[in-house]
Amino acid sequence: MKTVVLAVAVLFLTGSQARHFWQRDDPQTPWDRVKDFATVYVDAVKDSGREYVSQFETSALGKQLNLNLLENWDTLGSTVGRLQEQLGPVTQEFWDNLEKETEWLRREMNKDLEEVKAKVQPYLDQFQTKWQEEVALYRQKMEPLGAELRDGARQKLQELQEKLTPLGEDLRDRMRHHVDALRTKMTPYSDQMRDRLAERLAQLKDSPTLAEYHTKAADHLKAFGEKAKPALEDLRQGLMPVFESFKTRIMSMVEEASKKLNAQ
């Protein structure tokens, strides 16, 4: 699991920009990042799984069972690799089609977001200004109290705390007022954005493109299933030695335990 977490962390920390820096490629799209994340995660799970199998076989229970899981793990890993290679082109086609068919929706939503952002920006700027003014006023009121603390030290600490409490409460109340005012001004735009999103989704639902894409997706899933059958059969065949070895060993242990009980 540490390997998986490390792989996920590296992917998120580096992202597409690290790949672009080293390989000088064009920056990745969000779809590419999703696919890369899936690949890295699967590889990390495979590597960490082999590590856990190795740890289990070297344990006392693993030595007693003697399942020889590690011998079959590499074969299983190569089978999974072949499965990924066979299904890769079909999956790539699915992502490409989905990205193309929803391009207009992303474009319209970005346009709506930019429009709303332009309308609410003055309110955000006003809120930031008010915030800075309140902080500056608080600091101004704090300066004489700080000097008083330095001069009076410990004996005036309690008195200083009593003076600071109403100042902090006053700042909190004033900022709460500004936040409420900003929320009131932003509510219509939030409702407007929600309505526009619902409208865009309704357009997507009623568009003939979606119905056509639904048919394409069904065909894609059917083709995916046909291509997956041989690879999944190989995967099943690769797992059979593991299951048979496990079953044989367990039956042997049960039989041995039964003989010991009967002998008693």
From Swiss-Prot:
Residues 1-18 form the signal peptide. One of its GO terms (biological process) is phospholipid efflux. GO terms for cellular component: chylomicron; endocytic vesicle; extracellular vesicle; low-density lipoprotein particle; spherical high-density lipoprotein particle; very-low-density lipoprotein particle. Transmembrane segments: none annotated. The keyword Transport applies. Glycosylated. Palmitoylated. The modification Methionine sulfoxide is found at residues 109, 193, 240. Keywords: Cholesterol metabolism, Glycoprotein, HDL, Lipid metabolism, Lipid transport, Lipoprotein, Oxidation, Palmitate, Phosphoprotein, Repeat, Secreted, Signal, Steroid metabolism, Sterol metabolism, Transport. It comes from the Eukaryota. Sequence repeats lie at residues 67-88, 89-110, 111-121, 122-143, 144-165, 166-187, 188-207, 208-229, 230-240, 241-264. It is found in: Secreted. The keyword Glycoprotein applies. Major protein of plasma HDL, also found in chylomicrons. PANTHER family: APOLIPOPROTEIN, APOLIPOPROTEIN A-I. Belongs to the apolipoprotein A1/A4/E family. Homodimer. Interacts with APOA1BP and CLU. Component of a sperm activating protein complex (SPAP), consisting of APOA1, an immunoglobulin heavy chain, an immunoglobulin light chain and albumin. Interacts with NDRG1. Interacts with SCGB3A2. Interacts with NAXE and YJEFN3. This is Apolipoprotein A-I. The lineage of its organism: Eukaryota, Metazoa, Chordata, Craniata, Vertebrata. The gene is APOAI.
